[in-house]
Amino acid sequence: MASLRIAPLALFFFLAASVMFTVEKTEAGIPCGESCVFIPCITGAIGCSCKSKVCYRDHVIAAEAKTMDDHHLLCQSHEDCITKGTGNFCASFPEQDIKYGWCFRAESEGFMLKDHLKMSVPN
């Protein structure tokens, strides 16, 4: 009787382990899984961007880039992001061999809190 209770748990762990090893193998330079010919990358939330009509991981795009002009979000300083108009912060990747960073828009919490406190409260 106890083996019937343990069987679903064993099946769950087997499936979880197989998914984990599948995801680990596809993380390197493999595309994120979709094309971006007509629509942007759906997997943008997990770090994918469009390059040559295929969605790739952001760190792969930065590692393979020859110049900053290869992708509109590549940067080497905050000023590059501001002049390109793609954000105001250039974040570098943890890998030391990637010489370009990635632009994104960043707002400090203190700035937003200051604006929130300026709002008038209706009586």
Curated annotation (Swiss-Prot):
Q: Where is this cross-link: Cyclopeptide (Gly-Asp)?
A: G29-D58
Q: Which residues form the propeptide?
A: 59-123
- Show the disulfide pairing: C32-C48, C36-C50, C41-C55
Signal peptide start-end:
1-28
**How is this chain modified after translation?**
Contains 3 disulfide bonds. This is a cyclic peptide.
Pfam families attached to this UniProt entry = Albumin_I_a, Cyclotide
Q: Which InterPro entries match?
A: Albumin_I_a, Cyclotide, Cyclotide_bracelet_CS, Cyclotide_sf
Q: Example GO biological process term?
A: defense response
Identify the keywords attached in UniProt to this record, alphabetized.
Disulfide bond, Knottin, Plant defense, Signal
Q: Is the keyword Zinc-finger assigned to this protein?
A: no
**Entry domain remark:** The presence of a 'disulfide through disulfide knot' structurally defines this protein as a knottin.
Function statement: Probably participates in a plant defense mechanism.
Similarity remark: Belongs to the cyclotide family. Bracelet subfamily.
User: Any idea what this protein is called?
Assistant: Cliotide T12
Provide the organism lineage as a comma list: Eukaryota, Viridiplantae, Streptophyta, Embryophyta, Tracheophyta
